Amino acid sequence: MKLRRSVPIHGLTQFCSTKGRIFALGFSLVLFVPTPVSSSNSDAPLTVNDVTKHFINSSLNVTERNAELEWFKEAAKAYKGTKVTVISEDIPTHRYESQYLAKIFTQLTGIQVSHEITGEDDLVKRLQLQMNSGLHIYDGYINDSDFIGTHIRTGKVVPLSDFIENEWRDITLPTLDIDDFIGIEFTKNAQGTIYQLPDQQFANLYWYRHDWFSNPDFQKKFHAKYGYELAVPQNWQAYEDIAQFFTYDIQEIDGERIWGHFDYAKYEPSLGWRISDSWLSLAGVNDLGLPSGLPVGDWGIRAEECIPVGASVTRGGALNSPAAIYALEKYKFWLENYAPPESKSLTFRTAAQFLSQGRVAQQIFWYSAFVPILLDEDSKVIDENGDPLWRLAPSPRGKYWKQGMKSGYQDAGSWTFLHSTPDRQKEAAWLYAQFTVSKTVTFDKLLNGFTPIRHSDIQSPAFTAMQKGLGGLVEFYQSDAKNVWTPSGVNIPDYSTMAAMWWQHIGEYLYGDITAKETLFKLASKFDQHMQSLSAIPMRQCSPKLNMISDPTVWLNKPGAPWKEIVEKQQGVTLPLSEVYKLWNIDVR
């Protein structure tokens, strides 16, 4: 294996591979991630001992790793030669699974695994096709837990906790340890039934250039203009002030044009997720309460006793409320005034590569799944030692946000199995899924994507030792904040269909002649129409039943969401980084 760079920070070096590249991080522990075990025949069977040696970073000791791997080898005997095909979205973690873990599992067990990678929109379409048609297309999906509202209603997804206790009792890893999964609550219904098993999760956080913010000259100029410190913004007004400052007051650093804000806005499906991934929640559209706000939760949908009753303000929803209009207007205003022109050609998957070029001061909506790209040897946002020049912090909040509301978004891509898949295929895929999330494997997988899923990994000394190299990600996952940065909730009854409406309407707003208010009124009406149609379809539970239409003031004058318009401008508030991390451990609930 070629190592493209070796830069020890504390005298010892650990290497991670991603996107076909190798980059180095230095820690005080000896950690090493090799490529899959090789032999003269790349498809030759592997022994348990071979595989144990591969996963040397595991939280388990050698004896415990051997025991897990022996169990997989034995449990797979009845399925040897079975071919299974699974699919997931395109992020570094899943590329690691597809390129390495699938092959190792095949060589260990004899189950032939094909792990496909595709774009998130395509993944959703394929899942929806199998769900709607009943045809067998894939044996397993790594599907966002944002779909939990769909899965609990349709009855088309295997309820994992029921199967683990019954049909799959003999093929469920004894050391699977469900309670060790940090995102397991995201995949349950109100009764505690588990529908999906987390495979990876990543948070949406605030990202900023700590080196630029620490520049004494910049600090002095910012304070002179705005009357408070250049530091980590706590609200949207401070974020906007900082964006204005770097875009127009600083303008250039080392002869290169720089920008105070960064975003992505290409007119394609990921544009919808840019808003639907809790952007409205950060503005303060929701009600108080966790995980998503009660009774008004994500997407401004009101649900009463789990029954969706409306998205429009006239039905008690908040999708077209003053807070939602404010959120959408800020997105467009910042994009057009403070972001580089290239932003409008970028997507969820391409944005991180641009950010790594080093021309941006901050990003309010940054996905931690792309840490590997920012740490790549070609990145311009690391120093000569490979340490990040950036830091992560809690997301700034809009002027409607109140203590007790949801604080941010977290994606939890989770193993999902459909009843329409033949039993043998489903069972073999279940074995592979458990391998990818087993304690033997997960820490090495973490090092190849930085999307942790287990308490035992994030609380380990090895993860703690990575603090300096990850710019705040360790602090986030070791704090209570990981529990309140939540995915979309159960209020959303048909995620795939309704998600498609988002990007089409947001695209029209960005690139057409329509206001934020008009956009959200149209979208809220579409949501209500769709939920009305769903009410005629038999569902297992929580079928929509829309409220009667009332005058908007009826709901706006009631306590809670939808909130009345706030005319007053926020005063910008910032905090030094040393104080920011404390916020992740206090008052998060």
Give the location of each predicted region.
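Long, aromatic- and glycine/proline-rich binding clefts that accommodate carbohydrate-like moieties
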Residues: 69-71, 83, 387-397, 409, ...
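Short, polar/charged alpha-helical segment
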Residues: 69-75, 92-112, 207, 211, ...
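Extracytoplasmic/periplasmic substrate-recognition and gating elements
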Residues: 188, 192, 212, 336-342, ...
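Extracytoplasmic "Venus flytrap"/periplasmic binding protein-like
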Residues: 103-180, 215-217, 221-223, 354, ...
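Hinge/lid segment of periplasmic solute-binding proteins
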Residues: 43-78, 145-205, 389-395, 566-589
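Extracytoplasmic "Venus flytrap"
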Residues: 61, 66, 81-100, 202
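Periplasmic solute-binding protein
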Residues: 145-165, 181-228, 240, 263-312, ...
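Glycine-centered hinge/linker elements that transmit conformational signals in sensory
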Residues: 238-244, 281-345, 395
